[in-house]
Design a protein with these regions (language model features):
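Short amphipathic helix-loop junctions that connect adjacent transmembrane helices
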Residues: 101-114, 319-334
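Substrate-agnostic recognition of the 12-TM MFS/MFS-like secondary transporter fold
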Residues: 83-100, 120-138, 142-156, 177-235, ...
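Juxtamembrane intracellular "pre-TM" segments in multi-pass secondary transporters
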Residues: 76-81, 264-304
Length: 485
């Protein structure tokens, strides 16, 4: 689509068709760049030398004499999408490697698991405590700058930690440095994770959100599958400081990729200016607006409520399944590792089928069906004792969970206006991460009282009840839509 001058050009064969309708979109400025309708010749040639190179999205519809319609659109080309995916790859390489390496460093330094728990809380608590105001801030900021500065902070934090580790400071100094860096980066990750979902809307059309989200999740799951294997080999031969510096370099590369993108992501609502008290009042007001917006948009609220309840009911399943495999089925650590590798591949497989599901069915249909399939295979997991059957059931469970994550994100991007997307995303993250803690407590109590098998069986019954509630809620919502129309 790009000519020698770097501007957008397009040629499409139209043999067998009589009329054509063609649109070119400028995603940088959110405008329709060009539009044509006419009779087909041998091909359509768009003369767009005056257009910006940022014009990279198009849709063409061809009409035949017999009424047959052909529709085609462009998703990924050389340019912003590929550069963004480079940023995602480097970001996930750094995050996955640090997620694997940091616990090993802490255990080697202290020999105590309590420090791991504290560090884990530093990674999740910022979402609970700061998610809502940070989401409001993101909605008033240039999201590209938020992403690049977040990557810069992570680079600086891990580079500092690498220096401390390389200097072979005493354990106390090193542990304090790990605490401080983890806390700062935990807060930074709130900004980054909220911004990246909003940022996609600036250069990807709504019809392609699902594709981009599935690719991003595919990269994440692939990194989560491969990096521990590489990290395990590297940790024994590469110094801690150098490994940490490699992680830091990944975030520097991610920031550089974002800077190379030709995307305008201007501030919403004028940014945050003026005295600190006024800015705080603005953030509080914006947060309230986000909550009010979510309450009035039930089509956005229902998925949050259903997903939150689902997380409470299934939050402890991974722990229960591990106990069942080790204690009830007497699997060796090698067998458990094999099963976990298969389940990770299930999560990756989910990223490949989610686009087909999104194209073929409504969101609520996929959501409800997902609950039902997960219920069935969680119950089947309890029924089997063979390692291959256990691996197969958990493969499907993780596949469904992957699909669930992507469809919820895509649905939110499709339904929420860009000016509210940061706030709504932060509400989703704060709620869903918060209820995970409740899920661990609730599921752990059931497991401790009745045993892990019975806890999983009971969660299956609860998921069935939740599914019925979801069917009723969406039936009522669809009835109201029909009445309004």
């Amino acid at each position: 689509m790009t000519n020698e001058a770097g501007n957008t050009a397009l040629s499409i064969a139209t043999t067998g068709y009589e009329f054509y309708y063609l649109r070119l979109y400028d995603k940088t400025h959110g405008t329709l760049a060009d539009e044509q309708f006419g009779e087909c010749g041998e091909n359509i040639r768009m003369h767009t030398d005056s257009l910006s190179p940022d014009v990279h999205s198009y849709k063409v519809v061809l009409f035949g004499r017999d009424g047959v319609v052909y529709s085609h659109g462009k998703f990924i080309k050389e340019g912003n999408n590929w550069i963004y995916l480079l940023s995602v790859v480097s970001d996930n390489l750094g995050s996955s490697l640090m997620t694997f390496v940091l616990p090993l460093i802490v255990l080697d330094l202290t020999g105590s698991g309590i420090h791991l728990s504290i560090i884990s809380s530093f990674e999740t608590l910022p979402f609970l405590l700061l998610g809502l105001p940070f989401g409001a801030i993101v909605d008033r900021c240039d999201v590209r700058k938020v992403l690049t500065r977040s990557d810069a902070i992570r680079f600086g934090g891990y580079a500092l930690l690498a220096a401390v580790l390389s200097a072979r400071s005493n354990a106390t100094v090193t542990l304090i440095a790990i605490y401080l860096v983890t806390l700062v980066i935990g807060c930074t990750n709130v900004f980054s994770s909220v911004s990246e979902i909003t940022f996609i809307s600036y250069f990807v059309s709504k019809s392609d959100y699902s594709k981009m989200n599935s690719i991003v999740y595919g990269i994440q799951y692939t990194a989560g599958l491969l990096i521990p294997l590489a990290g395990g080999a590297l940790y024994s031969v590469v110094p801690m400081g150098l490994l940490t510096l490699i992680c830091a370099a990944c975030f520097l590369l991610s920031a550089g990729a974002i800077l190379l993108m030709r995307v305008g992501s201007s501030k919403g609502a004028g940014g945050l200016r003026g005295p600190v008290p006024a800015a705080v009042r603005t953030v509080i007001g914006d947060t309230r607006q986000g909550l009010s917006y979510l309450k009035t948009r039930r089509v956005v609220l229902y998925p949050l409520v259903l997903a939150a309840l689902f997380n409470v009911l299934t939050g402890n399943f991974q722990n229960d399944s591990l106990v069942i495999m080790r204690k009830s089925l007497s699997f060796t650590s090698g067998q458990v590792g094999l099963v976990m590798s298969v389940t990770a591949m299930g999560a990756l497989a989910g990223t490949f089928i989610v686009n087909l599901l999104n194209r073929s069915f409504k969101f609520e249909t996929v959501l409800i069906a997902n609950f039902l399939v997960q219920m069935c295979f969680r119950l089947l997991f309890v029924a089997f004792g063979n390692i291959f059957a256990v691996a197969a059931t958990l493969f499907v469970v993780d596949l469904c969970q992957s699909v669930l994550n992507i469809i919820i994100i895509t649905n939110r991007q499709n339904l929420v206006e860009t000016r509210y997307l940061g706030r709504v995303t932060s509400i989703y993250k704060a709620v869903l991460i918060g209820v995970n803690s409740l899920g661990f407590i609730y599921g752990g109590t059931l497991s401790n009282t009745f045993g892990p098998r019975n806890a999983v069986l009971w969660s299956g019954v609860e998921i069935l009840i939740l599914t019925m509630i979801g069917i009723g809620a969406y039936a009522h919502l669809n009835k109201e839509r029909t009445t309004d129309e």
